[in-house]
Amino acid sequence: MRSGFVAILGRPNVGKSTLLNAIVGTKVSITSSRPNTTRFGVRGVLHRAGAQAVFVDTPGLHRPKSVLGGRLNERAVGTLRDVDVVVAVLDATAPVGPGDRMVLSSAVSALAEPDATGGLLVAVNKLDRARPNQLVERLTQAVEAVEALAEGAAAVVEGAEFFPVSAVTGQGVDGLVEAVLARLPEGPAYFPPEMVSDLPEAIAVAELVREQLLVRAREELPHSIACVVTEWEWPRIRCEILVERESQKGIVIGVGGEVLKAVGTAVRAQLDEGAYLELFVRVEPHWQQRAESLDRLGY
């Protein structure tokens, strides 16, 4: 059979997590319109007859403004050392810019290493929102950006394939998946057929809490929020929400606790029946800049 690992790489907000969920056919990674929603290397497993592909959703590559941001970039680039194929995701509704070129350069550099195998696939996402002339322009820009990286990586560049897709509607996703599977090496199944993700349950619950907070958060809050499960004794789950300032604590709790109640209700609806979820908010100043805080949070 064919099997292997596939990195989904891109700058923030191009739809990487939505694409992973569309490929696997179920929700394994949280999504949000906020940049840098993904902080962990979430893995989704696709099972097909004679093939198994393990897709890794990576944090968005960006110019970091915090220690956390630097670690997220390191996590994304570090993933490239351990995969067979890279799917670089671009946004069809926005011009190919410096951030996209950084993504493509990182992918091509990793795939040009002597032991690299499967190559580069470029997914131009948000097909459903792009005008036809926009899509043609974006595909042309993507091809030109990859071709500009040919020095020292001619084989990678020549073998690159480009796919217009919509992670929201599913258009073009099957073609992308078939191209991924065709590039995987011969190998064993890494996960049993019933498994679609290997994300630990405690992290998955904490991420669901953060996802619901991002839906309700004001502009200044998303990057200041972290969530961690501190106690798990089923059915009781205790999740701690970290913010950086006292004023943010009040926003997260809401008037009369309305925000926290809404978050808890939305998350419980996604957990197994009987789960008792407790949410607590704690102020930890400058946690994004403190290595010890990031270590404790698993970042």
Language-model segments: residues:
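Amphipathic helical hotspot of TIR/SEFIR-family domains
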Residues: P98-A110, A226-E231
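Conserved glycine(s) of the Walker
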Residues: G15, G172, V259
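Conserved G1/Walker A P-loop phosphate-binding module
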Residues: M1-V85, L90, L242-V243, L279-F280
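P-loop NTP-binding site
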Residues: E201-Y299
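Canonical P-loop GTPase G-domain recognition
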Residues: G118-L121, D128-S197
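Conserved Switch II/interswitch segment of TRAFAC-class P-loop GTPases
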Residues: L80-V103, D115-V136
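Conserved, well-folded catalytic cores of nucleic-acid-processing
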Residues: T26, V45, A49, T79-V86, ...
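Catalytic P-loop NTPase motifs of RecA-like helicase/translocase cores
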Residues: T38, H62-R63, P95-V96, A130-R131, ...
